[in-house]
Design a protein with these regions (language model features):
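Double-stranded beta-helix
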Residues: 3-5, 9, 29-31, 88-131
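A short glycine-rich, His/Asp/Glu-containing loop-to-beta-strand
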Residues: 10-45
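Short, charged/polar surface micro-motifs in flexible loops or helix N-caps
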Residues: 28-30, 38-41, 61-62, 70, ...
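Short, conserved beta-strand element in jelly-roll/cupin
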Residues: 36-38, 47-64
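A generic "binding-loop/recognition-motif" signal
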Residues: 39, 50, 69, 85-86, ...
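Short beta-strand His + acidic residue motifs that chelate non-heme Fe in jelly-roll/DSBH
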Residues: 45, 64-65, 81, 87-93, ...
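Short acidic-glycine-tyrosine-enriched beta hairpin
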Residues: 68-83
Length: 131
């Protein structure tokens, strides 16, 4: 039974944004990772056609876009994102770390199955208004 020890885990560059490093692993059915974002490094709003996603916030506070709604979430909150649901985040603190879990698609990287949205500016504006 594999146990991944925190002092043995190595962060690797994200597939979609190589300047961001993530600790990520893939099993047979799921892929998981520990992700830390700093202000300005978050991905733009997007959706996944094949992946459901869970995010458990370990530290930090953020504005969250889920579909047509925005809200805030902070350490201890668990977010579920159904597949095909447009979602995005904006950091309200300087840094945010979370544990992410998705069903596996592709080679197992967390950023695979990443689909851009056509109304990006509108969604970013919506996130900017959330306090």
């Amino acid at each position: 039974m594999p146990i991944f020890r925190k002092d043995e885990m190595e962060a690797t560059p994200d597939v979609a944004r190589p300047h961001i490093k993530m600790i990520q692993y893939a099993g047979h059915l799921h892929k998981v990772g520990i992700v830390t974002y700093k202000k300005g490094d978050v991905p733009p709003p997007h959706y996944h056609t094949n992946d459901e996603q869970w995010i458990y916030i370990l530290s930090g506070k953020l504005a969250v876009l889920l579909g047509d709604e925005t809200t805030t979430a902070d350490a201890g909150d668990l977010i579920f994102i159904p597949r095909n649901t447009v979602h995005g985040i904006r950091l309200l603190d300087d840094e945010c770390t979370f544990f992410a879990c998705k069903n596996k698609s592709g080679a197992g990287g967390l950023s695979e199955d990443y689909t851009d949205v056509t109304n990006l500016d509108e969604l970013i504006e919506k996130l900017e208004m959330q306090e």
